[in-house]
Each structure stands twice: as structure tokens, then as C-alpha cells.
Amino acid sequence: ATAAASAADAGVVAGDAAPDSPGPLPGAVARYIDHTILKPDATRTQVATICDEAREHVFKSVCVNQAWTRFVNDRLRGSGVLTCTVVGFPLGAAAPAVKAAETRQAIRDGAKEIDMVVNVGALKAGEDELVLADIRAVVEACRDGGAICKVIIETALLTDEEKRRACELSVQARAHFVKTSTGFAKGGATTEDVALMAS
């Protein structure tokens, strides 16, 4: 699903490439990028800079913590760049109802994409029903608000079997995308994890 959606987005600008071009233009690549600022000490000036960079390069979205959602949405208005907000970030340890409420608030504030963190502890404990309920709560809130739901599974904390199960549960819950990591754990995205998740 990720590749298909991204390819469709890239196609908007890919036509500008020369017939013998070795690959996509920078503009096509830009439509794959979620320009992100999630550090706890981010200031209004820093968030504004991220927004302005995203507008300049026509990135896919700007991803921020909940407190900045309305500000980012206002700053990006008319640019074609989407507002993305994280939910249950970075630990994933909130109750499903809390994540759903956070999602609904983010959508009211203008978010078009939600990056939720799965309940990693429940996943590692084999509590699949809880994990499924966790993801579904956010997916349903996204569906009701017309937003995209992406599930962050925090691969650095998982075994390969747990990564597979997290992806399967995300698909079962009808999430739109699955992502590797928050950037706050001991490791981030690897090509091996991406290949495993896509298999």
C-alpha cells in the first residue's frame, strides 16, 4: 500500500522528467517525504521553519506533536502539503480510548495523516487482541475524520516474528501504512526491516 500510494503521488510531477532520465526528479522524491520535527523542545520558530521548507520543496507532509497541529495546518494552508500528527507518541502505552480521543482532536485541528505508535509491550506479550483494539481505535477515528492512519511498530524493540505479527495486525485493523520506528528507540529504519515488513 505504501509504494502504491507514494507512486501515485510522485506521478503528479514525474512527467517533468526527460524520457532518458535515470530516475525521478527531486520533485518526485519530495512527495515521499514527511518533514518531521518531534523533539520535545521544538519551538514555534523551528516548527515554522520546517513548514516553510516543506512548502518550498512540496513535501508530502509536515509531521509534528499534537500541540503544533493547528499552527502547522494554518501555516501550510493552500500549499498542498498535508499536516501529520503523532498519537501515543513515542511510547505507544496509552489506552486505546485515549489514542482515539487524541486522534479525533488532531483531525479537528487539521491533521490529514495520523502516525500512531502501537502498544509495544502488549505486542511483545502476545496480547494480540489488545494490540488489534489499539490500532482499530485509531483507524476508526481516522476513518470517521477522513484521515490516513499509519502504525509505527518500533522495530528496534521487536523480534522478526513480532514485526511480522505487528504488520499482520495492522492490516487486519485496516491501517493504511506501517512504519518502522519513532526515532526515539535504540535504532531506526533498516533495509532488512523494510524488506521483512513488505514480505
What are the roles of these predicted feature ranges?
Residues A1-I33:
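Charged, compositionally biased N-terminal leader segments and the immediate start
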Residues D20-H57, S61, A67-S199:
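Alpha/beta enzyme core
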